């Protein structure tokens, strides 16, 4: 038995200079796992609660000492002596101790850090890589694939201080034969984009996730510049590389309308879906995330109706990695893909349940980072372990983003042909 003998919580820093929670789970025999919780900037209103101290005299109220105290007290007391390999049992104990719908007593950040640290400790106890242990927990032992990366190379919205309303413009190297090749293609496009921006006298500073954040006149301008960068890097848009957008539309949804203040345009729900569809007709955009507000279910139904057969429509704020909300979407034919962020729901077990539900319904799965990250690379193992097919973990700079890519390189090296890179087949509507 992988008996838990100690649990330690601490406050550490994330990639935006804000505190976050880290946990260690120690087992008999000297085995240990350590994990940190990430934090989002554009968050869905129904996400599990990230517990912050609210003490304005310390980190502007963003301290996490209460969450750390919960780890070192209530959570430690509840899990001492338990078996770290019994992930579902551990997570359920923490959920029961919390006793709230959205984990606002203990904090999803506290529960998640311990949940992931326990999984890492259990993998160490079993003497297997983390991805192998997660695949066991998922009921898919030995079934792996390498994810197609969604690389956020140009930022707007909440992730940058510029005139672009759409939050993320991403490239997906679908023509690559391996993850290693996909990463190289993305890096070359990233550097090509930097030179294109410089040549136009535009800013080459980067946003929270490592993408460039130039002040462009419109969202279409962003797509046009990326097209130039892709071609300058020697690749062909539509075959070697497809594009993906994260609109984060909830951030510019006001009074039932979509206000693109950067462009001086206001759209109705259906009007904004028509606008996005027109972009997909001008550029090879294969995926659109959060193309409407999280509460605009009628709008989502229309968007799915007009684009769902050809474009991957990803629900992030829409579904918040929550099986109850995802089930409603599946039952009503809303979207066709889910973004998975384990801090939205707050435990590994619940995350795996959302992935399984999505896949069983024929939805694609995109494993995602948050804008506030750490060096913790657990999402890389999660993507491979569940054969998710796609991963979204930022640009090709900032070590908090690159840590995940580097872990994927290591995993691909270990697994070889046991973890194929399936390219375009992974993206809904594109196979």
From Swiss-Prot:
EC top class named in words: lyase
Superkingdom field: Bacteria
Active site residues according to the UniProt entry: 209, 341
Binding locations of Mg(2+): 246, 289, 316
Cofactor(s) listed: Mg(2+)
GO terms of biological process kind: glycolytic process
Gene Ontology molecular-function annotations: magnesium ion binding; phosphopyruvate hydratase activity
Annotated cofactor note: Binds a second Mg(2+) ion via substrate during catalysis.
Residue positions binding (2R)-2-phosphoglycerate: 167, 341, 370-371, 392
PANTHER family: ENOLASE (PTHR11902:SF1)
Quaternary organization: Component of the RNA degradosome, a multiprotein complex involved in RNA processing and mRNA degradation.
Its biological purpose: Catalyzes the reversible conversion of 2-phosphoglycerate (2-PG) into phosphoenolpyruvate (PEP). It is essential for the degradation of carbohydrates via glycolysis.
Name under which the protein is recorded: Enolase
Annotated organism of origin: Shewanella pealeana (strain ATCC 700345 / ANG-SQ1)
């Amino acid at each position: 038995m992988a008996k838990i003998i100690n649990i330690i919580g601490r406050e550490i820093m994330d990639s935006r200079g804000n505190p976050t929670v880290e946990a260690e789970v120690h087992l008999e025999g000297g085995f240990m796992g350590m994990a940190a919780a990430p934090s989002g900037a554009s968050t869905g209103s129904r996400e599990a609660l990230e517990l912050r101290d609210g003490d304005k005299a310390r980190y502007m109220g963003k301290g996490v000492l209460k969450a750390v105290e919960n780890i070192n007290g209530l959570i430690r007391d509840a899990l001492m002596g338990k078996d770290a390999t019994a992930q579902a049992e551990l997570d359920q104990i923490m959920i029961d101790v919390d006793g709230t719908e959205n984990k606002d007593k203990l904090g999803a950040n506290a529960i998640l850090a311990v949940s992931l640290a326990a999984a890492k400790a259990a993998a160490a106890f079993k003497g297997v890589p983390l991805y192998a242990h997660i695949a066991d927990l998922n009921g898919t032992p030995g079934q792996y694939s390498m994810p197609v990366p969604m690389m956020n190379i140009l930022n707007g919205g909440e992730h940058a201080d510029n005139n672009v309303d759409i939050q993320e413009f991403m490239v997906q190297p679908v023509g690559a034969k391996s993850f290693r090749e996909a990463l190289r293609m993305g890096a070359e496009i990233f550097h090509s984009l930097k030179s294109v921006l410089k040549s136009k006298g535009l800013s080459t500073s980067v946003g929270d996730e490592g993408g460039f954040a130039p002040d462009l006149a419109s969202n279409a301008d962003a797509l046009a510049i990326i097209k130039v960068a892709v071609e300058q890097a020697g690749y062909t848009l539509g075959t070697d590389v497809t594009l993906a957008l994260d609109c984060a539309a909830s951030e510019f949804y006001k009074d039932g309308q979509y206000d693109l203040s950067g462009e001086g345009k206001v759209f109705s729900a259906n009007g904004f879906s028509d606008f996005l569809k027109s972009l997909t007709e001008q550029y090879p955009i294969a995926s659109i995330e959060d193309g409407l507000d999280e509460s605009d279910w009628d709008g989502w139904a229309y968007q799915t109706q007009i684009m769902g057969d050809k474009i991957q429509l990803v629900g992030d704020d829409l579904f918040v990695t929550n099986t109850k909300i995802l089930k409603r979407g599946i039952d009503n034919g809303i979207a066709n893909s889910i973004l998975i962020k384990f801090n939205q729901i707050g435990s590994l077990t619940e995350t795996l349940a959302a992935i399984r539900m999505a896949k069983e319904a024929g939805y694609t799965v995109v494993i995602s980072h948050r804008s506030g990250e750490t060096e913790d690379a657990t999402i890389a193992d999660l993507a491979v372990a569940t054969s998710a097919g796609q991963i979204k973990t930022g640009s090709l700079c900032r070590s908090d983003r690159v840590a995940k890519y580097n872990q994927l390189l290591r995993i691909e090296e270990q697994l070889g042909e046991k973890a194929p890179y399936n390219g375009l087949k992974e993206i809904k509507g594109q196979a």
